[in-house]
Amino acid sequence: MCVEMKNKTNTTIPSQPQIPIQPSILPTQQTISPIPQIIPPTQPTLPKLQLDPILGSNGIPIANQEWSGTEYVRTNDPTKFIVITKTLDPKIARFLPTFKKPVITDIINKTSNSTLDMNKIITTNNFNVENAKALANFGNSCYFGTSMQLLFVMFHVRNFIVKNSNFTETGISIDLKNAYDSIKNLFITMNTAPKNDPIKSFPDYPNVKKQIMKEPDPVQMLEEDAEEFITQFMSDLDPKARNLALIKGNEYIYDVSNAQLNRQQSFSNIFNLIPLDIIKSNPTDTLENILSKTYTMVELREGVNTIQNPITSDYEFTYFVNQPTILPEYFLVRLNMVDPTSTNKLRHNIQINTTLVLTINGQTTTYFALAIIVHRGNSIRTGHYTCLVFDNQTGSQFQYIFYDDSLSSLVSIPTNSKIIPSNLYLKNITDSAYIILYGDITKLR
């Protein structure tokens, strides 16, 4: 049975109306597209300009560069290589005061020469050498005559030639060998008595000139240079003879940044060449001082004279020193008197020392003046040659013979003379000593 419940008041609770449940509608979330990013086009990267000089591995500007107008660039044109002593570019010029020169030992021993006692040396060494007949002028041949007199007094060279049938370099032409044989016979004739009777003819002279001086046909009977003839003549001799007058040494190349030796290369020359600039600056100095200045000279290589670095291929400023390392028996000096821009001769009055003392690697050699070849004239390509050649020692006198073509005269100086008086060999206002020959004082014959 169903029982209907009633409250005490007998009220009935009305039923609540049902509210329909509406599903909640969430608002749709809109997707916001990203704003497209505008990327500017890529600009090409410009190379950084070389606004400072290009430096070498040693921190010094290289020589093979130039200012292009906007930057420093390398150049392959040697005429544009930097001359740092003259450059107007302050960025490069500021490096010059930082250069460090090497310290060079002087091989000219002035102290020993100043105290040299010739009276003692005379008692222990031979000073009587063979003199020669004078040679006439065979047609613009005074260069030849004076050269022959100088070569004659180089006893051990001449003796090697006279005593040997093969005294030249191997492989020379028959014509050149015949020319040397002609000179050999001339040496023999020059040494025959009477010595005061000059040799007035030498039929082989044209061929000798052609072969020794390497001249093409037809031979021009013009004046030649005495130094060139002597150099050519010595160059084709057997090395045993040539080495008697061959000065050997090294060309030293130093880093300008620290004065350290970079590299060196050997050289060999017949003549010790005195630069024109040194003669210009010291026209009345002694030859001893001139040689000292020459062999202690530290030359800055710049511009077209710079040296290429074998590793970087750049051209670098370097200090350059040229010094002998081996002294020969015969020491030949040539005074460079020619202006390189012309053939004009620079006149000078260099005083010729009777003796020189050189010290190399602890070994000292004393040299005695054997010959002076003098050039007369205002141009080295023209003019006249004479020479003064040592003869012997008599008592307290050294005797020399002055040769002027077929003429010869005996002159003398005191044995204690430090300088050969210039009036013995300078006879004309345009005369200047050109070639000087010294011989090892212990080997004179």
UniProtKB/Swiss-Prot annotation:
GO terms for molecular function: cysteine-type deubiquitinase activity. InterPro entries: Papain-like_cys_pep_sf, Peptidase_C19, Peptidase_C19_UCH, USP_dom. The active site is at C142, H384. It comes from the Viruses. Belongs to the peptidase C19 family. PANTHER family: UBIQUITIN CARBOXYL-TERMINAL HYDROLASE, UBIQUITIN CARBOXYL-TERMINAL HYDROLASE 10. This is Putative ubiquitin carboxyl-terminal hydrolase L293. It comes from Acanthamoeba polyphaga mimivirus (APMV).
